[in-house]
């Protein structure tokens, strides 16, 4: 259902957007700018990472044994605490100690990206679109230039999805690793005399997906995440807003939209039925709207999921190999092999196993 403007309508005043038309140029994604703006004013995004989003709030910790859950999630907390409580004073101290001596923003961008790559990040630069920032969190993004950073999730763990035999849960360590390393990149920027503010991967204050696409790092996949040429669908995102006008990257057309329309293995394999086959209009964007409530409710009852990522041939066989095969033959590499696999779904609250086709109630 679309929103409509009317007299006396209550709206939320947001900071100006440097380039609100940038989203209109994303390959393979249709955007209604007027509706997107209206949603931002009338019904802006709310801060809600999946475990805290009603009606499944606290479902994840309730359905897990603390002895299993705490060792996985506890290491992800310190980077978030530093982000919320300490980085602002750290920023003031470091930029005062290291005044900026160069105004060459192009060189600064190269140095930042080189350092980020040494820590395992892919990176791109775009302008912050505050329509995709949660209500009340504009102050957490004090600058318009945003460096988007992506880190690869471990392929060997994801290949076990959804029955993670190599460990109890999927790769939660990515949140600890990327969380601390994004602060290291931020401190590198501060040592160049540039003020900045970092956001860690486990964060509901901003929609990373759209900014990663705007920064030219990948395209929107059918499963709702970004597909990159380096890692396919298996990365987690973080970002840094900084007080410098770095040269911007542009969205890229990798042919992913057409490939996903032909593939849709994530749709066929999703055990929760959370990924629709057809696109719909959602908050001004024409896309496949993932039912995140159904997705997370299912995820919470199992020892992880990640079936949508594991079903993606771009993850299994490599981006270039799959896209080259599709360009030559018009066929999806490994499709029949992936469809023939049986899912073994293990409930978190017991060692009971459910086979593909059975429902979890």
Question: Locations of the language-model features?
Answer:
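Catalytic cores of enzyme domains
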Residues: 113, 122-333
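Flanking helices and flexible, charged tails adjoining ferredoxin-like Fe-S electron-transfer domains
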Residues: 1-27, 281-361
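Compositionally biased, intrinsically disordered low-complexity regions
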Residues: 10, 30, 220-223, 234, ...
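Intrinsic-disorder/low-complexity, polar/charged segments
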Residues: 104, 108, 172, 180, ...
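Non-catalytic, usually N-terminal nucleic-acid engagement modules in DNA/RNA processing proteins
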Residues: 1-164
